[in-house]
């Protein structure tokens, strides 16, 4: 017999449907969120997208990367299929690597309003140069909670680096 959680899914559009690959470029409208059932328990979500592609804004040459988004949800979590569609929207989008990484951070924080979010753009070498871009943002919260979140993130970074992720 199949059992089911009480996760709210009625409002999700992308999951369970044929995957549309947007031609219009990245937009927060592509991202969907669902309610975080554990807002009083800080935990970290890490999503890696190893098939990221975009285009150089000068040469039009393809750039390849692994994009890693890490966040501590507050009231919302990102739905993973919508995240995949959002990542694919960069495929024919021309932008610098630094702009891409910061755009993803801005879009994720706009959509989710997480307590903390970090985006790592781990770009494949091109022309003999490898570029890694890290951008992060903490949500404004009361000082005691802010320190607890910073401690948690610091521990996460130490632990995560130990595993090479």
UniProtKB/Swiss-Prot annotation:
Residues 1-24 are annotated as: Disordered. Keywords: Cytoplasm, NADP, Oxidoreductase, Queuosine biosynthesis. GO terms for biological process: queuosine biosynthetic process; tRNA modification. It is found in: Cytoplasm. Substrate binds at residues 78-80, 97-98. Pfam families: QueF. It comes from the Bacteria. Its EC number is 1.7.1.13. Pathway: tRNA modification; tRNA-queuosine biosynthesis. One of its GO terms (cellular component) is cytoplasm. The keyword NADP applies. SUPFAM superfamilies: Tetrahydrobiopterin biosynthesis enzymes-like. InterPro entries: GTP-CH-I_C/QueF, NADPH_dep_7-cyano-7-deazaG_red, QueF, QueF_type1. One of its GO terms (molecular function) is preQ1 synthase activity. It catalyses: 7-aminomethyl-7-carbaguanine + 2 NADP(+) = 7-cyano-7-deazaguanine + 2 NADPH + 3 H(+). The active site is at 56 (thioimide intermediate), 63 (proton donor). Belongs to the GTP cyclohydrolase I family. QueF type 1 subfamily. Catalyzes the NADPH-dependent reduction of 7-cyano-7-deazaguanine (preQ0) to 7-aminomethyl-7-deazaguanine (preQ1). NCBIfam families: QueF-II. This is NADPH-dependent 7-cyano-7-deazaguanine reductase. It comes from Nitratidesulfovibrio vulgaris (strain ATCC 29579 / DSM 644 / CCUG 34227 / NCIMB 8303 / VKM B-1760 / Hildenborough) (Desulfovibrio vulgaris).
């Amino acid at each position: 017999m199949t059992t089911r959680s009480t996760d709210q899914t009625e409002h999700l559009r992308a999951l369970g449907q044929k995957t549309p690959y947007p031609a219009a470029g990245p937009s927060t409208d592509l991202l969907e969120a669902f309610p975080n059932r554990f807002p009083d328990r800080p935990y970290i979500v890490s999503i890696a997208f190893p098939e990221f592609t975009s285009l150089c804004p000068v040469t039009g040459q393809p750039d390849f990367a692994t994009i890693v988004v890490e966040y501590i949800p507050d009231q919302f979590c990102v739905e993973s299929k919508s995240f995949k569609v959002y990542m694919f929207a960069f495929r024919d989008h021309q932008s610098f690597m630094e702009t891409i990484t910061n755009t993803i951070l801005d879009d994720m924080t706009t959509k989710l309003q997480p307590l903390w979010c970090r985006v790592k753009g781990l770009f494949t070498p091109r022309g003999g140069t490898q570029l890694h871009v890290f951008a992060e943002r903490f949500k404004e919260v009361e000082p005691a909670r802010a320190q607890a979140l910073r401690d948690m993130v610091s521990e996460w970074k130490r632990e995560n680096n130990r595993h090479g992720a």
